[in-house]
Amino acid sequence: MDVLELLRASATGCYNTIFSEAWHQYVHKQIAAAVYWYGALFLLGVLLFVWFLYFKRLARLRLRDEIARSLSAVTSAATGVDHRGLRFRKRDKMLFYGRRMLRKMKNVSGQMYSSGKGYKRRAVMRFARRILQLQRENRPLEMKTVEPPAEYLEETIEGSDRVPPDALYMLQSIRIFGHFEKPIFLKLCKHTQILQLMAGDYLFKITDPDDSVYIVQSGMINVYICNADGSTLSLKTVRKGESVTSLLSFIDVLSGNSSYYKTVTAKAIEKSVVIRLPMQAFEEVFDENPDVMIRVIQVIMIRLQRVLFTALRNYLGLNAELVQNHMRNKNSSNPMATGQTTSNVQSQTSQATQSRPSGTTRTPTSPMLRLSREEHTLSDPDPNPNANNLHYHEMHGDAPYIDLYHYQQQQQSLNSPRRNSTAHVSEAAAASTASSPTTIDQRLVQSSAVDSLRRELGLGEEDAHIIEQFVLVRELEPNVTLITEGNADDVCIWFVMTGNLAVYQSNADATRASAKQDAKPEMLIHFVHPGEIVGGLAMLTGEASAYTIRSRNNSRVAFIRRAAIYQIMRQRPRIVLGLGNGVVRRLSPLVRQCDYALDWIFLESGRAVYRQDESSDSTYIVLSGRMRSVITQPNGKKEIVGEYGKGDLVGIVEMITETSRTTTVMAVRDSELAKLPEGLFNAIKLRYPIVVTRLISFLSHRFLGSMQTRGSNAYGTPVEANPVTHKYSTVALVPITDDVPLTPFTYELYHSLCAIGPVLRLTSEVVGKQLGVNIFDTANEYRLTSWLAQQEDRNIITLYQCDSSLSPWTQRCMRQADVILIVGLGERSHLVGKFEREIDKLAMRTQKELVLLYPETTNAKPANTLSWLNARPWVTKHHHVLCVKRIFTRKSQYRINDLYSRVLLSEPNMHSDFSRLARWLTGNSIGLVLGGGGARGAAHIGMLKAIQEAGIPIDMVGGVSIGALMGALWCSERNITTVTQKAREWSKKMTKWFLQLLDLTYPITSMFSGREFNKTIHDTFGDVTIEDLWIPYFTLTTDITASCHRIHTNGSLWRFVRSSMSLSGYMPPLCDPQDGHLLLDGGYVNNLPGHLWRYCRASMSIAGVFPPFCDYRDGHLLLDGCYTNNVPADVMHNLGAAHIIAIDVGSQDDTDLTNYGDDLSGWWLLYKKWNPFTSPVKVPDLPDIQSRLAYVSCVRQLEEVKNSDYCEYIRPPIDKYKTLAFGSFDEIRDVGYVFGKNYFDTMAKAGRLGRFNQWFNKEPPKRGNHASLNEYTFIDLAQIVCKLPETYVRLGTPDLFSEDEDEDFDGYISEPTTLNTDRRRIQVHRAGNSLSFSEAELDSDVELDLEMENKVDKATQSTPTLPDKRSVQTPTPSLFNLTMPIAVDEIDKSSGRVKRKLEATNTASIAEPEASPSIKAEATTQTTPPTSKRTEQDEHELEHEQVVEKQQVMDKQQGNTTNNDTKN
């Protein structure tokens, strides 16, 4: 059998060999014969052609010779002279040949345009070009690729050579105390001492006095903590130029309290030189300059709140650990709250009952107490079940009743000198409560409160008359809110007389913990017991309250409002020490230890925080400003890794992993940072292990975020790196020319930004009127920067409108800006002006973006954008903005303000270009990604219509393959009807098969030449560039030259769309003319992601069908982007989109394949295929396997996109349609529309559509949460002490800081506000009490507030809510929520006149000041008497005001000049 098999095999092989050889011989013979015949015929034709030319030329020569001979014979016969012997002269020869040559040149030039050899040559070249498909070199305009300047990626190394090093270090160290003038700085330098330390010497030890500031001039100092068991732990290492000090100890020393080192020790690591500055040196300066003392205390409190509390609370999760529940070494200044035993309390009670006058009773009631009781419901449980337990009150330090009769007898002898001054106050208190009997004498309560607060403020008994008229006493029921977190109106100094107050703070993890059932939005920080004070931190910083304060049980509190404290401060500046000392006493030892370790760093633009390859021993928190992280590659090239904004943590991963710095981080603009050393982290971790959990959670979120964006990075970046974010906090707006309507543009942008969150618009006029005309001087730099920093903290974004010249305000805007918007008119010249170049030199590191404005009346599309960008290489991004007609209307400043006072009342159009720009600046852009799928891409049109009907704005568009075509149509037209029409026309062209047959070519690279396909795309878009599209757009292609995907955001549109559709095998790759790379369909690597049509064509270069498209910029060959990424949602996310809708129309591979075992026979597959009686099998063929291999990376990328949290993945049901079914355009479009409409309706019902179409808050703004310029204005306490003149004089308010200062303004000065303002005060400013404006006031931005107030809605008013005794989450009644009628102006729409109506609003003051006579007269003529009844509390307040006014009149008559011009 083996022999037979061998014979059969040999015979088969022999026959096969014979047959193949015979066939090859026959073919070769036929080809050889054909070649011979064709060669012979070709040679014969050549010979005939040559012979014809030769014969023609020979005949021409013979004819010429015959004519010459004939003429010569005739001439000789006529003259009788034989010319054969004559010769011409040389001059005649030269003339003859010269004329002949000129005649020939003329004939040659004529042949170039008529006929002859030139015409034939051109015809042959045209024929050859058409046959060989040669193309002329016709490259379009390209974007110039310019490297950023060295300053953009490099730090500033230049130093201050003019200042000695020791003076420079000292100047930087004491900068934490604020800005000092040169004379004051020189006085401090006189007290400095130089300390020489050897290695191992102690700088200070435990029990040494903590009364100095130490500045390291050279060497290194180690600061460590000594534990109770004798072990030590390094806290931080102080290097050259750094300092060691505690600002909290600084307050102790100034307050006269001795401070000693208890747990902190400093030792020299090496030989060091240290500068010692005693804290007592500041005493001399402060005595001569009280304003400097107040400013230093304010800076210390601001640092405590912004640095210490921010770092420990927000990043380490420490809240209650920062304060101590019982103040240490607290000598209670409240004689009502002294700790007494139960027997003592009972004995005092019995003695008081026997010796109390008979007219008194035992039931404590007051109007406030009755009001609080009425607000509670009967069903509420008792919040304090132990309220009647005397032992309970003894243990908690809050006695329910303590007799004041004996206290009155004791205080009569002490208070006799000031009895007369307090008589009227006591009589007012008694008169206010005469209607209801009470046990506790109100006069004694008032006197006790005044005495207690006087001691807390550090005032003597002789100063009691200063504060007694400002002290108010209230009785509270449980769960009454005194002030809420973030409230700047009701800031007071609260002193607890009886009962307890609970201090809460919002939970930093409330957002992530909201999914948990036990999550609490607030955390209990500490309790305030009788004899303790609270509210000093917000009072000294001038900012809003950082805590929410509620009464824990029935309590009695005494308080002084913020305006009153500032008036007292003008007379007694040293009360800031008492307030600061009260804040310091409340802090825990942990905060004091952290105060030694934490540093507050100020960095100018260009200065480096740390450099690459340095040791990482600390991390940094960005308090304000912007940082840029730059990595230096081994070849020396620098690249941006990320940028950090306000609140970001920098360098945390490197510090924890103990690795060297991987990047260099430098300040883009002037910035403030908090430095947290590694030793502090270790010390806190040992004491509070919960910090480790917080850090793990923080690092996990950062690691997951980097994993989602790592796939699209060209190079590996550390986990620490933060991708370049497009969320800015400050934006500067600069006009290119004077005719740019910058003010209307700023208003429109402000209008759109207001829908996202609190925003502020600042101009030079606004800042000048708020802070003074000299605020831009160098001496006022601290005040200006502090004020601007506070405005940035209170708003999500701040708009800095620059002047049209390089003024000091413009320079300040450049220093404060995170990004600069250069605004120009798109239809004007693109030339760069001198002012614009100065702006670039002034802020070289700041990112700049170009904004081109177009009027909507011209219907013109953007054009020539490349010229704008090439002229400005410093621009990193551009925006096309279509503007309404009102922006380009020429009006005066007042008319513009009046116009936008009405515009700002309306809801912004979320689909406008201004809203798109607003979302980009705030990091809320919505991106649309369209995947590839051939004819199934018609579903994109239906989905676009469904998206438009769902109200979802589209800010960015990216596409691959057919998605690149549809996305480019939408970005170009932005009209669903026009987009549908053009897409349908293009699909019809794709169904004309006779044109495709003419495009067939020899299939070496592809089946089609791609010429007709290019023509269809070019006819659709024309010569449009990607830069000229209305909406930012990108397409993705597969670069087969560099074996990667390429993202095209600029260049020829049709070319890169064509390259993204170059499917392998159908079209040749597109060759990038810039670098010669071959580009294929981008879907091979990423199926969801210049002239416009070129990149569209490149994105549609299907390999094998159409040839790859050659990029005209670099020569790379481009293919369809579907080979790399068919749904490039990750690319869209990296480009700045926060929310993405990804639509996938690609085909799905069959994964249900047959398991055929270890081997596979093709004959078996053939048998299964052709035998109808067997079960079919699913085995991929060779083309299918190649296709699956090509799409491997695309499938992996698609799965990552589906699992991401930033993308909404949508796939319409279009699987039944084939890739080339372009004839079913309308049917596929309808399928996509119906599916999209149902999909978005389902999302809307489920509440998941809000992040796409409800990015703004539709609720009317409320007083409690709306930010206004005056509400968050920076309060410079030093200015109060100096009694500087007012910047903006207010008639009718004699004092700069009146008690009702917070009610003077309730809106931005720069733009209209939706809050109510006391219109009566404003009318005093006008001539004749009118609200109209004179022509001299047309350029005032402040008038915008006044116009806005006329159109305020009653919805802005809030009403008090009933408290919940148990739940903290339920809104609780506020102490200031007292409904009182006030007069509000309203405009009659029919007549346009101002009317006065009576509304009920929540007053923010306890005692509303009485109106001035002029105001009363105005109110009498325009108001109607209130119909509501006054409450007993209102009567009490009015009577109290009358008593105070009588006292003031008597004091004036007696010559007593106390502070009589204030209002209580």
Curated annotation (Swiss-Prot):
Entry keyword annotation includes Membrane: yes
Span of the annotated motif GXGXXG: 932-937
Annotated Low complexity bias: 338-367, 422-438
Chain sites annotated for binding a nucleoside 3',5'-cyclic phosphate 2: 456-586
Sequence motif: DGA/G, positions: 1081-1083
Pfam families: cNMP_binding, NTE_Ploop, Patatin
Transmembrane segment boundaries: 35-55
Principal location: endoplasmic reticulum
Membrane topology listed for this record: Single-pass type I membrane protein
Binding site for a nucleoside 3',5'-cyclic phosphate 1: 176-303
Region (Disordered): 329-393, 409-438, 1352-1374, 1400-1464
Described purpose of this protein according to its UniProt entry: Phospholipase B that deacylates intracellular phosphatidylcholine (PtdCho), generating glycerophosphocholine (GroPtdCho). This deacylation occurs at both sn-2 and sn-1 positions of PtdCho. Its specific chemical modification by certain organophosphorus (OP) compounds leads to distal axonopathy. Plays a role in the signaling mechanism between neurons and glia that regulates glia wrapping during development of the adult brain. Essential for membrane lipid homeostasis and cell survival in both neurons and glia of the adult brain.
PANTHER family attached to this UniProt entry: NEUROPATHY TARGET ESTERASE SWS, NEUROPATHY TARGET ESTERASE/SWISS CHEESE D.MELANOGASTER
Name of this chain's protein: Neuropathy target esterase sws
